[in-house]
Amino acid sequence: MSIPTGFPSTNGRDGWANFDQATGFERELLDILRSARQSGAVNLFWITTDVHFAEAFRYTPFADAPEFHVYEIATGPMNSGIFPNRDFDPTLSPERLAFVGPGAATDVTTWEQAKSWFNFGTLEIDADGTLDAAIVDTSGDRRFELELQPSSR
């Protein structure tokens, strides 16, 4: 949600992060989040992919509702160019929980180095509603884990 996507940026963006673009996407996202908040939701979980690194965020988009959080995990792709981007849109008060990637694409010069950054995400919801999400590398190691309990309304 906060990671600008679309390349080159002169072609526009295909995500909600507005950065230097004034688009309707951000307003649309805020409408969706307001609706979820009004329905009583407190923990939303978003899955995004194809950003060429992995990252996890927790958002607290409404100052008057600190219990309302949105979580996002972005992963992958599993075997592609690595283009880490540490910039993100601060509009929804994001807190970065994890970043899995090199400092810069130029830091990766060999196949062995590249393999350490390839990743995918997993998501499991057990019978009691506990959500377990993870960023996993090609060795099967969990580089980041997040567990969310279902809310009681």
Map each language-model feature to its residues.
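Long, structured stretches of catalytic cores involved in phosphate-ester chemistry, encompassing
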Residues: M1-R153
